[in-house]
Amino acid sequence: MYVDKFMNFILPMEKNKININYNTVTEAPGIGATAQQLSMLYTRYRYAVQFCEGKDVLEVACGSGQGLGYLARKARKVVGGDIDTTNVATARDYYKGRTGIEVLKIDAHQLPFENNSFDVIILYEAIYYFEMPEKFFTEAKRILRDEGVLVMCSANKEWPDFNPSPFSKTYYSATELVELLEKFGFVAEPLAAYPVEKLTTRDCVVSIIKRIAVQFHLVPKTMRGKELLKKIFLGKLSSIPPEINDEMGLYLPPQSISRGTRVFGHKVIYITARVK
């Protein structure tokens, strides 16, 4: 039954591929999401806000900006930047008139800020889109103040059910990110989040279908397409809110892992990196 539903949904999409932009792969307000997806969104900013008390904060690749307001509760100033015009317009419209929040169109490879401008930089689910991540790390180091912090998270490519995002260039493991960051003058701590739970029979079927879909490039390319697929297999979804809030999902804090450890049993990796 699940296989039939999946193929009936996906084959027409593959016959009618369209050009996509970053907005179409952004977890934007109003898109249906599972409880775990909402928890992941909430966890990102709940984790980051601990570093933001009284600080100047920059979120690079902020998408539609759902996290900016949450960070601004503690931060002195929050700047959100994204390369996608639609994302920037959405965030600007929502935060219009909000004190302490600024939204800019920026390129992560060439950040338009003076040296030593920020205490905290956040980069969530975006490093794998960058053509030259080393340029971003160089720029991040340049604009961070002494003892500044870079907080990152990424889908875990070592998880067996990992599915690469459209437009992605290169995914990095936790170990690879730590090694890369340390080449650019950071001291990095790897963490992992969302351990894989024991699978039910239904979960096993969905997992098999997902792996087949990934192998043959049949996974929908847009967030809206993925939303429809989730409805088929998972039923009712909840809408992603325009601003992160404490009631939207469970907080599952990332856990420290040993350096050099391969991470097969978690869906998400985090890195907390500090300027040497």
Can you name each region flagged by the protein language model?
Residues 2-110, 137, 251-252, 262-273:
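Conserved N-terminal segment of class I S-adenosyl-L-methionine
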Residues 14, 151, 196-276:
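A C-terminal cap/extension of S-adenosyl-L-methionine-dependent methyltransferases
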Residues 109-120:
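A short acidic, Gly/Pro-enriched loop at the edge of an enzyme's catalytic core
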Residues 123-126:
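A short beta-strand submotif of the Rossmann-like class I SAM-dependent methyltransferase core
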Residues 134-146:
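A short glycine-rich, Lys/Arg-flanked "PGG" loop and its adjoining helix->strand segment in the class I
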Residues 148-154:
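Conserved beta-strand signature within the Rossmann-like core of class I S-adenosyl-L-methionine
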Residues 161-180:
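Acceptor-substrate binding/catalytic loop of class I
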Residues 186-197:
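Conserved S-adenosyl-L-methionine
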